[in-house]
């Protein structure tokens, strides 16, 4: 028997999902607990409900065949109240639970917050007090008294301690204390390109160039690197594994005229099976279990938008998929149909051999959600990276979140992070609502800004500060965005950081994916610029991502050249220095809450040098970034600081930061 319990904080975007809470569009349920946040969110739902009401009218979910959990509610629990920052200078929380005495709220980003302990199964009245004089009800909570005062009403329903019947999949072997995803550093392992631990399963396809073929990486190789301490040495505590789902045999033509295999995992075929060229379910479970022993969480890439046309699911259930023909043309994304606009973006096929699920069909949606739940349970993973989110219907996301809440128990929330490949922040935000959809998405607009201003040295740091100021809190107080500078769909960052950048900030690099491939830089400057970009990435809010190989500045053009096999030997001194810097940055981040959850304030700004202060409680640090090729001197308020990144003590009155370096000062 596995015992899971937690002390949960109910807020607009994080409402104890692990204990069976779901979004509900019907306000005022007696057994519910209202989200306590004045911010309007992009997704559906105004109530959060707990217990047996969860799941009604929410679409099909997997039938696990196990008896219900035995749950015991606690006497009380912590409740997080939130209010969006406006022009006020202070906000207090007042309610009948404390005699209407104001409780001071603290500013976290663009949101005022405070946590109070309330009795379970009680009803409380409350309001927010702005600047000590203006009393306002919670604009997000529709439940208010009708006595003329308009006090907001909260029905407190604390999550229970639940005993789950043992269903057998991959038990956690590591610590069971709740993990805060804001404390994570993600490392993306493209399994086939990372480490070959078992040469007996190597099986490349004939007639396919090496760059687009199976190259031998496998789960055994990942397991070996976990056990060798590579990830803990790098300061990584979350692994994102490329999809382990079975891929098709054979080769298939890409839109560039070259043949490809399904080595990447994005052509799912037998949806319940692990791809044999990387391992089997038992090995996947072992990878997850071993990671947990080292305090590393595991996220699986999950592909829900489409299948390969050789999939038995497609062959047996053709009515679950959109027709390739639409409007008298073949609806292929970027061909006969658009990638970006409804209704075509939800129904277009990525390739003519990748049928697109029609999730307006309830049976299709239910099957897909149940399959995702099965992978979560069988693998023991802690979260999903969800592929191509903008191409699916929102109902799939809400059904998945509901099913996860009801059927998957973890010591921490099951993290859902999406991929919406766009510079449109509004579109990215549309799918984020941690109570009912995604916890966050990968922040492509932030990535483009960091690449442009730091790696490519275009524009100035005024552009970066302007972007960050608008981006802070944009996706909601409960969201946890995935931040990154490199990924598997874009050219490698070291080639963007060359003296003459080899690609643009949004350039796919496809013109140099097969020919005229970028070289591994032989000089230190490109690696140093990557180091400055990592210093920014690892000192800003969100959960930062390291794309495999970026820690050593692995070179590469467009897909598939940006997926070269990981370099495990023969690295240059410049590559080794970059890896050491990244490791130091991750460990400083782990030691300082200000770098993970702090409030940011600009303290110096110039064209090529930028300093900002990060504060969380008593933890206060100053980050200095110098992107230029010359030393930069600035003045700070403090008389002296300890340089956590480079060592030693420096004077704040005249602080010089060498070319292409960063400082983290305490």
Residue ranges and their predicted role:
Residues 178-184, 194-379, 396-409, 414-418, ...:
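Substrate-binding/active-site clefts of carbohydrate-active enzymes
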Residues 72-125, 129-159:
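Aromatic-rich carbohydrate-binding modules that target alpha-glucans
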Residues 91-96, 630-647:
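Beta-strand-rich binding/interaction modules
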Residues 13-74, 160-173:
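Ser/Thr-rich, Pro/Gly/Ala-heavy low-complexity intrinsically disordered linkers and tails
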Residues 624-628:
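Asparagine-centered strand-capping/turn motif at beta-strand->loop junctions
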């Amino acid at each position: 028997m596995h015992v899971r319990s937690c002390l949960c904080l109910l807020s607009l975007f994080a409402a104890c999902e692990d204990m069976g809470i779901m979004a509900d569009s019907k306000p005022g349920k007696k057994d519910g607990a209202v989200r306590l946040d004045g911010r309007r969110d992009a997704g559906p739902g105004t109530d959060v409900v707990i217990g047996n009401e969860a799941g009604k009218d929410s679409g099909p979910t997997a039938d696990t065949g196990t008896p219900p959990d035995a749950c015991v509610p606690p006497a009380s629990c912590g409740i997080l109240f939130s209010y969006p920052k406006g022009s006020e200078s202070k906000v207090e929380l007042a309610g009948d639970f404390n005699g209407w005495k104001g409780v001071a709220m603290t500013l976290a980003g663009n949101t005022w917050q405070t946590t109070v302990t309330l009795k379970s199964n009680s009803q409380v009245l409350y309001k927010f007090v702005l600047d000590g004089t203006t009393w306002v009800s919670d604009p997000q909570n529709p439940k208010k008294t009708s006595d003329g005062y308009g006090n907001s009403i909260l029905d407190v329903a604390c999550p229970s301690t639940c005993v789950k019947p043992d269903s057998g999949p991959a038990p956690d072997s590591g610590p069971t204390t709740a993990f805060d995803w804001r404390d994570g550093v993600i490392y993306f392992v493209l399994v086939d390109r990372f480490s070959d631990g078992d040469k007996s399963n190597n099986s490349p396809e004939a007639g396919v160039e090496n760059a687009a073929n199976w190259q031998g990486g496998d789960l055994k190789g990942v397991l070996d690197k976990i056990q060798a301490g590579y990830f803990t040495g790098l300061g990584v505590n979350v692994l994102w594994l490329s999809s382990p789902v079975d891929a098709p045999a054979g080769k298939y033509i890409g839109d560039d005229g070259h043949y490809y295999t399904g080595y990447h995992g994005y052509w799912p075929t037998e949806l319940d099976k692990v791809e044999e060229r990387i391992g089997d379910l038992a090995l996947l479970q072992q990878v997850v279990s071993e990671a947990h022993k080292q305090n590393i969480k595991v996220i699986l890439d999950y592909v829900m938008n489409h299948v390969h046309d050789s999939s038995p699911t497609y062959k047996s259930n053709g009515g679950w998929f959109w027709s390739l023909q639409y409007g008298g043309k073949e609806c292929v994304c970027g061909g006969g149909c658009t990638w970006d606009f409804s209704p075509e973006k939800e129904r277009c096929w990525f390739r003519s051999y990748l049928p697109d699920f029609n999730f307006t069909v309830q049976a299709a949606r239910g099957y897909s959600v149940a399959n995702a739940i099965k992978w979560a349970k069988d693998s023991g993973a802690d979260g999903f990276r969800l592929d191509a989110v903008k191409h699916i219907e929102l109902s799939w996301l809400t059904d998945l979140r509901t099913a996860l809440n009801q059927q998957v128990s973890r010591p921490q929330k099951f993290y859902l992070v999406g991929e919406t490949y766009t510079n449109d922040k509004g579109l990215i935000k549309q799918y984020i609502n941690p109570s009912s959809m995604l916890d966050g998405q990968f922040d492509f607009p932030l990535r483009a800004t960091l690449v442009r201003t730091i790696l490519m040295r275009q524009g100035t740091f005024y552009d970066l500060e302007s972007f960050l100021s608008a981006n802070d809190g944009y996706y909601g107080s409960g969201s946890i965005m995935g931040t990154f500078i490199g990924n598997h769909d874009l050219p490698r960052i070291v080639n963007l950081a060359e003296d003459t950048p080899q690609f643009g900030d949004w350039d796919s690099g496809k013109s140099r994916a097969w020919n005229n491939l970028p070289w591994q830089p032989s000089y230190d400057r490109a690696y140093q610029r990557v180091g400055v970009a990592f210093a920014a990435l690892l000192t800003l809010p969100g959960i930062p991502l390291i794309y495999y190989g970026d820690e050593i500045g692995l070179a590469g053009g467009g897909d598939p050249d940006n997926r070269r096999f990981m370099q495990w030997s023969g690295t240059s001194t410049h590559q080794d220095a970059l890896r050491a810097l990244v490791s130091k940055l991750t460990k400083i981040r782990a030691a300082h809450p200000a770098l993970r959850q702090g409030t940011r304030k600009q303290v110096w700004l110039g064209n090529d040098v930028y300093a900002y202060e990060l504060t969380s409680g008593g933890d206060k640090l100053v980050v200095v970034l110098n992107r230029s090729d010359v030393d930069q001197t600035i003045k700070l308020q403090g008389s002296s600081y300890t340089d956590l990144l480079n060592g030693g003590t420096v004077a704040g009155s005249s602080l010089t930061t060498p070319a292409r370096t960063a400082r983290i000062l305490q």
